[in-house]
Amino acid sequence: MEVKFFEGDWIWDEEIYPNVYSCAMVYANGKGFRVFEISDRKNEVHELLDFMRKVKKAGHRLVGFNSVHFDYPLLHHILTKSRKVLKEGKELKITAKELYDVGMKLIKNQYDEDNKFGSAIRDKDVIIKQVDLFLIHHFNNMAKSTSLKMLEVNMRSQNVADLPFPVGKVLTNDEIDILLHYNKHDVKETLKFYYYSYEAIQLRKDLSITFGFDCTNFSDSKIGETLFINRLEQAKTGLCYTQSKHGGRKINQTKRPNGIKIKECLFDYLKFDRPEFKAVHTWFKDQVITETKGVFSDLLEHQIGDVAKYAEMKV
């Protein structure tokens, strides 16, 4: 495979345990590996900050896997706290335990169904530009969700390594050394996937210029959705969103207090011959919903009418 990369990209990954935080990164050409550690035995937070200042000053980017919702918010905590204490003239104190607590909160937020945007930092507040391969390939979609380990298998990696210790374990010095090795391994595998993703990243770079909005971390479908909405808004301002006094915007939604009749959403040309399909079709036409998320999940037998008798049918 021909190796193509963008100048100024750093591939990175973080690991966090109660007594150790590690951040590993390598330049997009595969050279210049760096590993920073914050633990009971070593605290390289100032070295990490010095390096990040150079990355920021050079206009470079950090490329990760699920970094927008985890790795970067954790780094952002370090960067913003550093700025705050510097402004106040105080000494910077950051421990692995502090970062671990932040990390666990970030993970919890990722599984919060009521928190649509998780822990992502607002674009205008991001200090160092991010490229997230996880989002670009739409792996945040439940139907497409894929782990880095699965990608390692698909990329025919010689070594597929999983997290060496259970989450929350207090590590010994020897175990910390193993964790640092694992952290570097994940960065190498992310780098490999970055090479596979070159054309997708280039496309988003070109489209961002063409359409006038940053779609670096957008999936293919989100690019289309955003472009469509922008075109509608250009044709008639306020068609899709209502602007707030504070500069934000709220999506316009049609209120349906009496629910949505599914039969009104089904095309008339839908016809089925098999009895089990007819049963499903008939059942859907009888449904009225007031929510759209999870309403047809975990249904009991008495709730699905004639469909139940076909549930275990072999075809």
Ranges and model annotations:
Residues T146, N154-D162, G168-V315:
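Conserved "right-hand" nucleotidyltransferase catalytic core of DNA-directed polymerases
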